[in-house]
């Protein structure tokens, strides 16, 4: 699984002109599921996201996690994180999971975050979404359960 994690002051997802998910201070997490991913990848990613120490402590150092600051998480599915742009000008998405598997593991990831006690909002899987956010920092991190980066 791949994720782009952004520290935000606020974020929301709009589908068909309706807000379907919104958070205040916290993390916006774009998640892509690969064709070879399993529940172990979900578990690794949920543990990593919930434990990332990217919020500032009283001394201004990045030393606190989303759990420590009581922040919220907005999770948005994004299969394009598996777009391969190495050849030609059109991305190939052959490494992305098929929709059924992608949805199953996306929902599992959300469930694991909720079980950790986090307030989680989400977009709508496979919908065309408009994502609005106010970055904090900005702080943006790339995660890959295959540890490619």
UniProtKB/Swiss-Prot annotation:
Catalytically driven reaction(s): glycyl-tRNA(Ala) + H2O = tRNA(Ala) + glycine + H(+); a D-aminoacyl-tRNA + H2O = a tRNA + a D-alpha-amino acid + H(+)
GO molecular function list: D-tyrosyl-tRNA(Tyr) deacylase activity; Gly-tRNA(Ala) deacylase activity; Ser(Gly)-tRNA(Ala) hydrolase activity; tRNA binding
BP term (GO), one: D-amino acid catabolic process
Protein EC: 3.1.1.96
InterPro entries (alphabetical): Daa-tRNA_deacyls_DTD, DTD-like_sf
GO cellular component terms given for this protein: cytoplasm
Compartment(s) of residence: Cytoplasm
Stored Gene3D superfamilies: D-tyrosyl-tRNA(Tyr) deacylase
Short sequence motif Gly-cisPro motif, important for rejection of L-amino acids: positions: 137-138
Record function comment: An aminoacyl-tRNA editing enzyme that deacylates mischarged D-aminoacyl-tRNAs. Also deacylates mischarged glycyl-tRNA(Ala), protecting cells against glycine mischarging by AlaRS. Acts via tRNA-based rather than protein-based catalysis; rejects L-amino acids rather than detecting D-amino acids in the active site. By recycling D-aminoacyl-tRNA to D-amino acids and free tRNA molecules, this enzyme counteracts the toxicity associated with the formation of D-aminoacyl-tRNA entities in vivo and helps enforce protein L-homochirality.
Domain comment as written in the entry: A Gly-cisPro motif from one monomer fits into the active site of the other monomer to allow specific chiral rejection of L-amino acids.
Family per record: Belongs to the DTD family.
Subunit description: Homodimer.
Annotated protein name in UniProt: D-aminoacyl-tRNA deacylase
């Amino acid at each position: 699984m791949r994720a782009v994690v952004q520290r935000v002051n606020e974020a929301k997802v709009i589908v068909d002109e309706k807000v379907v998910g919104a958070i205040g201070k916290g993390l916006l997490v774009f998640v892509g599921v690969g064709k070879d991913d399993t529940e172990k990848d979900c578990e690794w990613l949920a543990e990593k996201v919930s434990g990332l120490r990217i919020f500032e402590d009283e001394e201004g150092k990045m030393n606190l996690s989303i759990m420590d600051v009581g922040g919220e998480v907005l999770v948005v599915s994004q299969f394009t994180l598996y777009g391969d742009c190495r050849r030609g000008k059109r991305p190939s998405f052959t490494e992305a999971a098929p929709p059924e598997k992608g949805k199953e593991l996306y929902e599992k990831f959300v469930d694991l975050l909720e079980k950790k006690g986090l307030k989680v909002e989400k977009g709508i899987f496979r919908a065309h979404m408009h994502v609005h956010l106010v970055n904090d920092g900005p702080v943006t991190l790339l995660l890959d359960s295959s540890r490619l980066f």
